[in-house]
Amino acid sequence: MGLVAVLIGVNVEARAAMSRGFNRLLESVVSINVRELAFESGARRYTSSLGSGVLMSEDGVVLTNAHVVGRRAVEINVTLSNLERVGARLVGWDHWTDLAVLRLDMDEVKRRGFKLAAARFGESEKLFPGQEVYAVGTPHGLTRTVTRGIVSNTNRYFEDTRGIGGYETGMFNTWLQTDAAINPGNSGGPLVTSDGKVVGISSRGYLGANNLGFAIPASTARVVLERLVQEGAVVRSYVGIVPGALQDLENFYALALNTGVLVSSVDPGSPAAKAGLRPGDILLSIDGARVDGRFPEQLPPIQNLIASRPIGSELRLSVKRGAETRDFPVVTERLESRVGEEWALEKWGLSVRRVSRTYARENQLEGSDGAVVIGVQPGFPGDVAGIARGDILLKVNQQSINSLDVLKQAHAAYEASPAPTLIETQRNRRVSLLIIKP
């Protein structure tokens, strides 16, 4: 009888500790309202979005999704667990992992006497399918909503996907899959275990399906959070190869199982292309570190192995091509998104985006000068001149557009004193001269 009493006492104490941990977690979950500048319509406009986040330190550091705060937030307000609203600023943003960090206005927090409760990370590496988890957030504006489910998969892989605004995400991590309900507004909120430890950051649901939600593992979030707080960005190296899983191809390439990874494509003009790598090569090792990409879930660690090297460093890629194995020295560049800086040239009725190096390579452009037209206002001078969405603006008044500042200055001059402006454009590889008239 005494043993039973002891066991019951231990169980009650454990449940109480778990309850305290979960209640503390609830105090750390916040709602995020963002007002963001957008340029897609050929003019400046403001959009509003709502998401969730979680306080990760008592000095006001909030972890959320990159797609919640966007790239051009002009106002961020965070609603705390006490329902009070506090201003915040963007500290850092990493669309590659869909994570962002905010910092609360701590002067305001202290002036108003608020006490902040910080959440703690759990070990996502130790999760197992069937384990109970909870998603906490603000679905459809309903604050501090808790939904319960299980871990459906601990290592879900998605091929490189395009997020909101066309930004790439998913190259450098796998995802936790859960059947806990994740709806619009949950994004950025924590996925937690029963003791309130954060094991993931809710990121997306699966359109048209039920009980399919996905979260960024804490193992990824912990590293990105630290880098964003310290440096404001996560800088990664790039060589220009896209790895592909070798599953079912080993016999074709006469390879032993679990040997190497397929080079499925090579970006034109990239360091790998300049070094001589080709699609169909088998990458065996990177600086002597053996790689194994038999399954898609094994690809993110290979991407991270390259991304973690210093920019400008030389990598030795050991490659099998046919019966021959040889080493290729490849010098890394800084990884860059295909989505460049955006701006609105309102008097002309044009929204533009800087041509990035990645965009230029994808579209086989000769260089990375220029700006892509992403929006045109009907009836405005740009539209009347014949400029269309998707055109690339190469020169303005015979000056190469090597940055958006060139276009901004020409537009400012037009705004101050309207005069005909000569624009050199490219459409389907055909270059034309157009005149924007007042």
Language-model features: where?
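Bacterial N-terminal signal peptides
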Residues: 1-9
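N-terminal activation segment of mature serine protease catalytic domains
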Residues: 10-44, 48-52, 58-61, 65, ...
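Flexible, gly/ser-rich surface segments that form the specificity/activation loops bordering the active-site cleft
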Residues: 17-21, 111, 119-123, 131-170, ...
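C-terminal recognition in membrane/secretory proteostasis and scaffolding
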Residues: 20, 48, 66, 89, ...
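Active-site region of chymotrypsin-like
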Residues: 28, 40, 46, 105-120, ...
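Short conserved beta-strand and strand-loop elements enriched in small hydrophobics
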Residues: 32, 74-82, 133-137, 313-321, ...
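Conserved active-site neighborhood of the chymotrypsin/trypsin-like protease fold
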Residues: 37-38, 55-145, 184, 208, ...
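Short, conserved beta-turn/loop elements at beta-strand boundaries and strand-helix junctions
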Residues: 58, 93-97, 154-160, 246-248, ...
